[in-house]
């Protein structure tokens, strides 16, 4: 039995080796069938075929291949082959891209069937491979099938070798492949069909007589949910161009590798202009470029000029139509071969030996001439068909998706990426994703592949490469679902709209705000904004913006002070673009998409990049009022200065009231409903002389109607004002803008006010009342409105008594100070009763603004005071209380010595200090309780220590001074007050944008500039791809495989995150212990000095108060307060 087992094992290994070494399509199928029959395996059982084959073939060569494939299957995206269970997929065409798609779908667990109408792989064309393509094929075990695959500096392979390699890998995955079978048509499901497999497919066998098995197998309907390989194409015209492909036999098989003329392989045209110049003069061979690879064949591709082909007799007759020009009847094959041979000898410096042409599958020399004047690409990458409630997903990969130029490797590279995107789409389809979301993502990826993908963008050293789009394309603009509705084809359009609940829902990844504007709408908006500017004609979103004048005109339209448009020159492309990019970045926060030099170097800007960039201007300025193009600003200066004085009031209301963005079709003028409402409200202020004539009690019916309308509008605006300010506090940027704008407006109306420096509210000194400056007639006329302008005032402490004066008291005070204003306001109130309501609301808004200013000033003063050490605090207290006139209290009775004497209250609102209090004023019944400016805890502790202090103190001025110092010190060290940091004042009025409009201009790691097209984002930070590394091990990490530490702001890979957390905990614990010890030491060393300084300051204050009566020195002590830590 042992010998029989060894024989069986050896025979299976030999059969597997025969399968690996097969060199033709038919030979591979024959070897595979023999292997499966010998091992008693069923290829139809696709779910368990690979596992059974791996268990029965255990040779050392096979184990190396199984290890490669097992590592590939272990990726999390595949879910151990269960991501697409129950999904049947049909691949039409067995080319490299179709087979790579089939392998990826099989790894996801889908049932895959491949049909190919040929049974031979005869494409001798050599294919250039990008680095990531080489890495992907190595992960599939390409070296096990073809040992010379990309060895050393070789980065190319013949198409038939690549196709054969993928063909064998697909068979090992249990993929059902049928050759000599051609796709015919689709059969729609019946109305009463209940089977979930919805589309029936008929295939017919080719004329091959030995394919009876395939004919029997496919004669019955086969049903699928996904079909890959169907699509229409669209032509992109180019300049007239012809190319030759001719292949020579390489009889020296060992010479596969870099050729003596390797410098010609895959290089762009500018490098060969000097090399090809002599050929034009000697042999009349005019070539634009040439590419040469040496593999199993000598492979040449060159582009020739039309006149050169006519001179050499390759083209017989000259026709205007490219199709007629290159038809078989108009091409001399003998002259074509002679031309190809002569060009190859010249390009290789006559180093090639005498070689014969290779023979293609038609039995003819492998020399071809083709036209790539028009490049073809598919209009759509995928669509969904729905019939009778059943859906079919149709996708497209390969050459029909985008016509490639094979020697440069674009076809294989983009074809493999399209295969990965299609596999990801099928995976989401199998998991129940919405059709429109799938189509939107697929079309977005297609746009990126067609326009912005280069081999430098893809990094092959990312580990195992998967079908997840974020691995390949981390940042791409996703289209919205409504852009792909035409790709959802159904026969229910007449009775059911596509905007159903299951179709219009948006996924999280699709709802990108920057793609919300449609390109045609954006173009119309740009044309409207740039109309009237010289040398600016916007006809598209690409070439019209290259000169930079259109961008500068767009900025000048809304911010004319930023751009001197008249000084710009049309031929200065670099300067114009760089100026516009810098201004947009500095003033609006819009990151530049490129630089001025790069914009000038490109023939035409990328449309997708321009749409993304211009959409940010659209989102920023679409609600702003239009400014006319002012070419003669000098002449209009007087007109602008003669505007009515109520313009400031209207500007303030424009900032305060919420601005509604009017749609384009409705925005026919600047006067929206809201603007009309504002103008109507202040019409009564513009014409004060006409106010008495509009009396409500008049008998004029027309006047009554107008008055009622005006009252309703005033009430409506007052309600909007109240709702605006009773909501949550606005963000910092808007508050900053409003304060800056209103401060400028206040300077234009009133005399300039000098803001006093912020003072700690505990130690504010009494100030003399400053006489109010003479007010202009304009401010008196708009007294009720101009009072709303926020003026920064010192912090106000509550006075003993009511928390705030009532409205009646404030009216009386205002009447005493400005009687004329009161009379005028009364006349206004009698004329327009709603104006009084509006003034009350504005007065309430002023109170809210005052409170906010007080709180900010108090927080700033507290923060500055707490930054000082104990000595500086004591010196500060002594200097403050040394200059304050303390109240001259009489000697209180001993029974009341434990009460805290009153400290003089000081505020910017109190005109005079309180008068000296009598002995009765210091009694407990009449002494009002003083509230501290800071909220603190531990009142019991304060009461006990203050009792001990005041028992040991003497009476008179000394006790008052010491009491003031002691109470302040107790409040300082008992209050655990941590003020919020105040936002720094920005000099320039720069508007802050949401994350989806603006963008960072510096990398989070290297602090260098990062452009929109190259940046990545994670956790709200922007950075370069190469800078995204682990902070512990400096290893590059992916967006989906990182951990962010909020405490230290670093990114880590998953294995090192816990290590960094543990290390940070220990370091933080040691830092806190060391800081606590240092603080205790500082406190113990400075507490005695602080007490001594405070005592001396109190004595000096008493001596300088003006009382010449001698005061006996009485010993006293101040309690020692332990510091509060934590």
Curated annotation (Swiss-Prot):
PROSITE patterns: CH, LIM_DOMAIN_1, LIM_DOMAIN_2. Residues 918-932 have a biased composition (Low complexity). Its EC number is 1.14.13.225. Its main location: nucleus. It catalyses: L-methionyl-[F-actin] + NADPH + O2 + H(+) = L-methionyl-(R)-S-oxide-[F-actin] + NADP(+) + H2O. Keywords: Actin-binding, Cytoplasm, FAD, Flavoprotein, LIM domain, Metal-binding, Monooxygenase, NADP, Nucleus, Oxidoreductase, Zinc. One of its GO terms (cellular component) is nucleus. A motif (Nuclear localization signal) lies at residues 659-680. Zn(2+) 1 binds at residues 1003, 1006, 1024, 1027. Residues 748-830, 892-935 are annotated as: Disordered. Residues 516-619 form the Calponin-homology (CH) domain. Gene3D superfamilies: Calponin-like domain, Cysteine Rich Protein, FAD/NAD(P)-binding domain. The keyword Zinc-finger does not apply. Its cofactor is FAD. SUPFAM superfamilies: Calponin-homology domain, CH-domain, FAD/NAD(P)-binding domain, Glucocorticoid receptor-like (DNA-binding domain). PANTHER family: [F-ACTIN]-MONOOXYGENASE MICAL2, CALPONIN HOMOLOGY DOMAIN-CONTAINING PROTEIN DDB_G0272472-RELATED. Nuclear monooxygenase that promotes depolymerization of F-actin by mediating oxidation of specific methionine residues on actin and regulates the srf signaling. Acts by modifying nuclear actin subunits through the addition of oxygen to form methionine-sulfoxide, leading to promote actin filament severing and prevent repolymerization. This is [F-actin]-monooxygenase mical2. It comes from Xenopus tropicalis (Western clawed frog). The gene is mical2.
